């Protein structure tokens, strides 16, 4: 079964939920696992069925720089603990779209480049909207219950490191420096996340993405 067919299977499961409020879909996975690509493909597949879809990322809910780098710019623990503003993420995006929510939501709280808060004015969701959110630490225990369907993009650490280092070569000045950052900060933080929260275990679908052309899907019983 090819990639498009596997993603269609996941979309089928999501649309069977038939909720009375927007369906909040989470896409987690280690850094450079392919979360954003997967989330975009899933969004396109659901859009083609005529449903309104909104894409969002936890990376638009960063903490200010002073908080993000309080433990050091290369600190794995700092990245894991301090990168994102989970209060804004939950209160401004996830909860308004859940049961008894008012359907008024934001998809961004902080501008990463200017390092200033963002107040763009709230958006109004349709009850049949599907929200697809990607983020590395998305399925932490105090957040995951706010998603109606949870995906974990499962990619081998070495493969993800090579993909990520290639992607970030320009940002870090060389492939070698980018690879070091993945080893020492990003993926070290991901291992903390996996050890503490076991996100794969709580996922409804595990999307094995080490082989981009031939991914596999494992569906897990909802708990």
Go through the PLM ranges and name each one.
Residues 1-17, 166-170, 184-223:
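NTP-dependent small-molecule kinase module
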Residues 30:
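P-loop (Walker A) phosphate-binding loop of NTP-binding proteins
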Residues 35:
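Conserved lysine of the Walker
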Residues 38:
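Hydrophobic positions on the alpha1 helix immediately C-terminal to the Walker A/P-loop
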Residues 54, 63-113:
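Conserved nucleotide-sensing/catalytic segment adjacent to the nucleotide-binding pocket
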Residues 116-170:
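ATP-dependent NMP and nucleoside kinases share a basic, alpha-helical "lid"
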């Amino acid at each position: 079964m090819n990639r498009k067919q596997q993603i269609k299977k996941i979309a089928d499961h999501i649309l069977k939920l038939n909720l009375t409020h927007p369906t909040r879909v989470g896409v987690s996975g280690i850094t450079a696992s392919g979360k954003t690509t997967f989330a975009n493909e899933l969004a396109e597949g659901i859009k083609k069925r005529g449903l309104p879809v909104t894409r969002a990322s936890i990376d638009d809910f960063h903490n200010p720089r002073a908080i993000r780098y309080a433990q050091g710019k290369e600190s794995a623990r700092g990245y894991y603990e301090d990168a994102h503003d989970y209060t804004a993420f939950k209160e401004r995006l996830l909860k308004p779209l859940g049961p008894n929510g008012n359907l008024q939501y934001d998809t961004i709280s902080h501008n990463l480049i200017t390092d200033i808060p963002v107040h763009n004015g709230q958006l109004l969701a349709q009850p049949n909207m599907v929200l697809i959110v990607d983020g590395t630490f998305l399925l932490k225990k105090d957040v995951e219950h706010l998603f109606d369907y949870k995906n974990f993009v499962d990619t081998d650490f070495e493969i993800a490191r090579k993909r990520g280092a290639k992607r970030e070569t320009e940002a870090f000045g060389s492939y070698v420096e980018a690879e070091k950052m993945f080893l020492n900060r990003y993926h070290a933080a991901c291992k903390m996340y996996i050890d503490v929260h076991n996100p794969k275990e709580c996922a409804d679908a595990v999307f094995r993405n080490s082989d981009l052309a031939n991914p596999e899907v494992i569906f897990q019983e909802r708990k």
